[in-house]
């Protein structure tokens, strides 16, 4: 098995924000290579940790690394949008904290066979869950022009969505687009030369957009956070690390909605209890990686940590 290096981002900050209780029940919604999982486990005595990942490779790698799983740890090979169902199956209806480390892990990016990266020539795949049928090849070759424009614009915030989608539409009538490098060349051809020279790799935004569409990432995140807000006990916290603006905007909006005072008539001397929010923002502004972390882990640059706490039912 190929070894892939993975540095867990905001390791101490994200777990410290959970304020772990030794006897509590916690969820790591994104197991990855187990960095946050181990950090939480180290603080548990009689408590319990359930770690989710839809990527079979992540489950297998962490299982092998542990050898024998600690009795406090349960691994669940499911998407975190199945949070409530999976926990109910385990007899759990309330938890003390939930952690999310969103996006693609370094091993997924660095495994050329997975097709997540524009740096390697590989089959167009991008599935986090290898059990699903929809992959990047299907989207690129079969989705209508209008749908390609929509996802490139909405999920990639790509200014040249129409031009790139048109190049793809024309090319696939000649032969199927099956590899990442084929797609990269079409993306480059759809972006004016001057624009290609700025803003990083020209394929970055479109690859992000296709990956989000393949894995239905934003819908899964919204659904999972809605469940998480209901699952946590009073005093429990949700800790979320995001790596791009779409995720961060969604988390920020959802957290703001549930932590804000409901509409009440002006001039009331006291806000009634019924209008008080059930949650509070632990950090008004996102927590960012330290200079020390940025110096050793370049993939931490875009990371933001947001934390919310349930203060009453």
Swiss-Prot record:
What cellular-component terms does GO give this entry? cytoplasm
Give the matching InterPro entries.
RsmH, SAM-dep_MeTrfase_MraW_recog, SAM-dependent_MTases_sf
Q: Which Pfam families match?
A: Methyltransf_5 (PF01795)
Q: Where in the cell is it found?
A: Cytoplasm
- In terms of one coarse class, where is the protein primarily found? cytoplasm
The EC designation for this entry is 2.1.1.199
Q: Which GO terms describe its biological process?
A: rRNA base methylation
Residues recorded as binding S-adenosyl-L-methionine, renumbered to this chain, are: 34-36, 53, 80, 101, 108
Q: Which GO-annotated molecular functions does the record name?
A: rRNA (cytosine-N4-)-methyltransferase activity
Q: Reaction catalysed?
A: cytidine(1402) in 16S rRNA + S-adenosyl-L-methionine = N(4)-methylcytidine(1402) in 16S rRNA + S-adenosyl-L-homocysteine + H(+)
Q: What class of enzyme is it?
A: transferase
Q: Which UniProt keywords apply?
A: Cytoplasm, Methyltransferase, rRNA processing, S-adenosyl-L-methionine, Transferase
What NCBIfam families does the annotation carry? 16S rRNA (cytosine(1402)-N(4))-methyltransferase RsmH
Tell me the protein family, please: Belongs to the methyltransferase superfamily. RsmH family.
The record describes the protein's role as: Specifically methylates the N4 position of cytidine in position 1402 (C1402) of 16S rRNA.
Its recorded name reads: Ribosomal RNA small subunit methyltransferase H
């Amino acid at each position: 098995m190929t070894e892939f290096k993975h540095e867990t981002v905001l390791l101490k900050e994200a777990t410290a924000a959970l304020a772990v209780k030794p006897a509590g029940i916690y969820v790591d919604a994104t197991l990855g290579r187990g960095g946050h999982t181990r950090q939480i486990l180290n603080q548990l005595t009689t408590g319990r940790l359930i770690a989710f990942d839809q990527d079979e490779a992540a489950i297998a790698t962490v299982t092998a690394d542990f050898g024998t799983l600690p009795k406090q740890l349960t691994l669940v090979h499911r998407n975190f949008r199945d949070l409530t169902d999976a926990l109910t199956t385990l007899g759990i209806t309330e938890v003390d904290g939930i952690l999310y480390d969103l996006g693609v892990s370094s091993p997924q990016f660095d495994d050329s066979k997975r097709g997540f990266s524009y740096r390697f020539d590989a089959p167009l795949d991008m599935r986090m869950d290898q059990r699903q049928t929809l992959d990047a090849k299907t989207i690129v070759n079969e989705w209508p022009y209008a749908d390609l424009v929509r996802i490139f614009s909405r999920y990639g915030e790509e200014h040249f969505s129409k031009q790139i989608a048109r190049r793809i539409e024309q090319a696939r009538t000649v032969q199927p687009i099956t590899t990442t490098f084929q797609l990269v060349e079409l993306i480059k051809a759809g972006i004016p030369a001057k624009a290609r020279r700025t803003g990083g790799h020209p394929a970055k935004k479109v690859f992000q957009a296709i990956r989000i569409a393949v894995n239905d990432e934003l819908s899964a995140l919204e659904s999972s956070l809605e469940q998480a807000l209901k699952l946590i006990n009073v005093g429990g916290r949700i800790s979320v690390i995001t790596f791009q603006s779409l995720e961060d905007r969604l988390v920020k909006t959802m957290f703001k909605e549930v932590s804000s005072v409901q509409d009440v008539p002006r001039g009331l001397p006291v806000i009634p209890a019924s209008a008080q929010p059930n949650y509070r923002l632990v950090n008004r502004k996102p927590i960012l990686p330290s200079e020390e972390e940025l110096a050793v882990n370049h993939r931490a640059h875009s990371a933001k940590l947001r934390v919310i706490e349930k203060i009453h039912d």
